[in-house]
Amino acid sequence: MNKTIVIKKKIHDFKKTITVSSDKSLSIRWVLFSSIASGKSTAYNLLMSEDVLAAINAVRKLGIKVKITKKFCQVFGKGIEGFKYKKDITINAKNSGTLGRLILGLLINSKYKIKLIIY
């Protein structure tokens, strides 16, 4: 089932269902991308591994609301500059190199010190 979505104009409202397999790397990326999107993003079949939970905890530390139920996970993104925190923070990426690499790119312009722990 290969379908391509081509976007030719600015998106104001994107309501499309995309079905992918439950995968750790995709789940981490979904959490991070959803956190910088504007509005609510919902994922079904999200892999709830230790690394994905670390990504969820990381965006929560950055002021993003995340709702987890038995059926789905919702991230309430605040846009590309929506991370809100008023002090130096520590983000524990656990053992996730994917989370560590990707979140540094999102936080590169922070005016606060950010300590990233990966073990």
List PLM regions with ranges.
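Short, structured segments at the rim of ligand-binding sites
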Residues: 1-119
